[in-house]
Amino acid sequence: MNPVSPRSLTLIGAGLAGCLLAILLSRRGWQITVYERRGDPRIKGYECGRSINLALAERGRHALRQAGAEEVVMAKAVMMRGRMVHPLVGEPQLQRYGRDDSEVIWSIHRAALNVALLDLAEQAGARVHFYRRLHTVDFDAGYARFIDDRDDQPHEIHFQSLIGSDGAGSALRAAMQRKSPLGERTEFLDHSYKELEIPPLPGGGFRIEGNALHIWPRGRYMFIALPNDGGTFTVTLFLPNAGEPSFATTRNGDEAFALFARDFPDALPLIPQLKQHWEEHPPGLLGTLTLDRWHLDGRALLIGDAAHAMVPFHGQGMNCAFEDCVALADQLDAHDDLASAFAAFEAARRDDAGAIQQMALENYLEMRDRVDDPEFLLQRQLEQQLQARWPTRFVPHYTMVTFLRTRYSIALARSEIQREILVEATRGHSDLSRLDWAALETIVHARLEPLDGAH
């Protein structure tokens, strides 16, 4: 058994959120121990099973700055200026995310980011133990047992408090549920995803525009590609589970080849190993996790995907989890006891987590159905015009979520108002030439207060 120090926390999961939290708290003087069920990715390679690239936004970068990790991480990131939309017929068109290159997002490979944060966590003083799968927790006695799956050997510890940063399939959440039900609910989409890869050119470099997120929208399904710093693209097909086409009708490499030849013809030559990768990579599930509570007084707390997993369509899962880490560190600074800190953390983050979960689902519909829709494109034009005229009041949804650190719940509420304005103002119009700008000014000033941080 390991003795427990007065300011010690035990983290379950050495993924992205676990490592960042370990850095933040170690630098504040906490004794941090992290237990990870997998092996050390620096020795045996990354085995997460998910290589969906991550979109790093201002929220995530702010958290990295607080941990002194931004410079190391950004050296591995690739700038994305916007969505490059590939229609079935016609040339690809870039839809910028922001006004200029000061408003971009960054693509980074999950494995590279995890390894960088793991190094920094250990440098900050955190102790990380690999091959430790959480097996049993006695919350009353402060006792936990881990199993090394290589030899089935148990490892037992005493703890002051457990923090679950172990993802959507959280073992700590399951243990907490057995102690006291958390009201867990998971709503799965009727779509799944499959990951593939676009290799670099023979001499290096990208085969398609490297500073964009590429989307092939096809109504009920879509294909996306995010750049890596080595010239590759991590590409993901989102497809229904049933119907035509679907994973039920695309069962092998030959059927996948036929699907791409029909629906993504310009992408087909970019993926030489399509058939092989299709058969090697299993489909992944997509779901939204909600809980009635995230903590057991001061004995255990869930953060990130372990508390509020979301679908990946707003690129905010990691950014939200990183915000969790900073918020938790701040609450631990502000409170003398863990129970109060955990309760304050949950109170501060619950509404925002629910808001971004909702916005992520809505963004899926936008990405697959609307990015090539004329009405949507006209609304985007008007959105840009309104921002240019009243930049502190009419702040685009994407700007609030991605380039600012506006609370997600506030961004959601303002976005709903702004969507109503855009839909009503463009109804019956094919362009912006006949809009009543004086009336729009009155509406914008009446319905939207100036937003902190907007400029």
Swiss-Prot record:
Q: Describe the reaction catalysed, as an equation.
A: L-kynurenine + NADPH + O2 + H(+) = 3-hydroxy-L-kynurenine + NADP(+) + H2O
Q: Which InterPro entries match?
A: FAD-bd, FAD/NAD-bd_sf, Kynurenine_monooxygenase
Which EC numbers characterise this protein's activity in its record? 1.14.13.9
Give this protein's Gene Ontology molecular function annotations. FAD binding; kynurenine 3-monooxygenase activity
Instruction: Please name the GO terms of the biological process aspect recorded for this protein, alphabetically.
Output: anthranilate metabolic process; kynurenine metabolic process; L-tryptophan catabolic process; NAD biosynthetic process; quinolinate biosynthetic process
User: What are the annotated disulfide bridges?
Assistant: none
Q: Which domain of life is it from?
A: Bacteria
Q: Which Gene3D superfamilies match?
A: FAD/NAD(P)-binding domain
Q: Which Pfam families match?
A: FAD_binding_3
Keywords from the UniProt entry: FAD, Flavoprotein, Monooxygenase, NADP, Oxidoreductase, Pyridine nucleotide biosynthesis
**Chain's role:** Catalyzes the hydroxylation of L-kynurenine (L-Kyn) to form 3-hydroxy-L-kynurenine (L-3OHKyn). Required for synthesis of quinolinic acid.
Similarity field: Belongs to the aromatic-ring hydroxylase family. KMO subfamily.
Listed name of the protein: Kynurenine 3-monooxygenase
Q: Mind giving the lineage of the organism this protein is from?
A: Bacteria, Pseudomonadati, Pseudomonadota, Gammaproteobacteria, Lysobacterales
